[in-house]
Swiss-Prot record:
Function: NDH-1 shuttles electrons from NADH, via FMN and iron-sulfur (Fe-S) centers, to quinones in the respiratory chain. The immediate electron acceptor for the enzyme in this species is believed to be ubiquinone. Couples the redox reaction to proton translocation (for every two electrons transferred, four hydrogen ions are translocated across the cytoplasmic membrane), and thus conserves the redox energy in a proton gradient.
One cellular-component annotation, GO: plasma membrane
Residue stretches in coiled coil: none
Homology family: Belongs to the complex I 23 kDa subunit family.
Keyword Protein biosynthesis attached: no
Cofactor binding summary note: Binds 2 [4Fe-4S] clusters per subunit.
Superkingdom of origin: Bacteria
Pfam families: Fer4_7 (PF12838)
Binding-site residues for [4Fe-4S] cluster 1, renumbered to this chain: 72, 75, 78, 122
InterPro entries for this protein: 4Fe4S_Fe-S-bd, 4Fe4S_Fe_S_CS, NADH_quinone_OxRdtase_chainI
EC number: 7.1.1.-
Protein species of origin: Chloroherpeton thalassium (strain ATCC 35110 / GB-78)
Name of this chain's protein: NADH-quinone oxidoreductase subunit I
């Protein structure tokens, strides 16, 4: 086919190009330059990485401000929106200010895909994605976390709660824009 096309002219490689020596030297030069580049890895077990507020780690339940229990009102939205169905809730009524709270609240961490849908849909900001990323289990039973393992104080997830408030304010339209649309 090359002989029939008059525009095609095969390029002749010289001796060094046929040996691929220049290309090998270019690769070695790049490798040598990388020896003196700054190190960007951390020595993990000794040095822990501090994730930013945007990071979605293990989901946790947030305590109420008065530390009398969880913020959760057992509405069940998080369990309905969870794609892998990792969350299970059973509600019971209480005599406290809120009418209901979860009698059982479990998250199967083997099923959780850390999507954050449960956090987005929660009306009480009761379930939040924490900054915990080093999650290990000895057996499958330990991977199912109940209320006692999930409950954390507000101070521990305050950075994430502040991020969520800022994020939700950016997503929602200000009231002035909504009133202008109605006119």
């Amino acid at each position: 086919m090359h002989e029939k096309n008059p525009k095609f002219k095969p390029t002749r490689l010289n001796f060094l190009e046929r040996l691929y020596l220049p290309e090998v030297l270019k690769g070695l030069g790049y490798t040598f330059r990388q020896i003196f580049a700054p190190i960007f890895t951390t020595e993990y077990p000794d040095v822990k990485w501090q994730p930013p507020a945007v990071f979605r780690g293990r989901p946790v339940l947030v305590e109420r401000d008065d530390k009398t229990g969880e913020r959760c009102v057992a509405c069940g939205l998080c369990s309905r929106v969870c794609p892998p169905m990792a969350i299970s809730i059973q509600a019971e009524e209480t005599e406290l200010e809120q009418e209901r709270h979860p009698a059982t609240f479990e998250i199967n961490m083997l099923r959780c895909i850390y999507c954050g849908y449960c956090e987005e849909v929660c009306p009480e900001e009761a379930i939040v994605m924490s900054d915990e990323y080093d999650i290990t289990f000895n057996n499958r039973e330990n991977a199912i976390m109940d209320k006692s393992k999930l409950l954390v104080p507000v101070a521990r997830v305050q950075k994430r709660l502040d991020f969520l408030k800022e994020y939700k304010n950016k997503v929602r339209r200000p009231e002035e824009q909504v009133s202008n649309l109605e006119v």
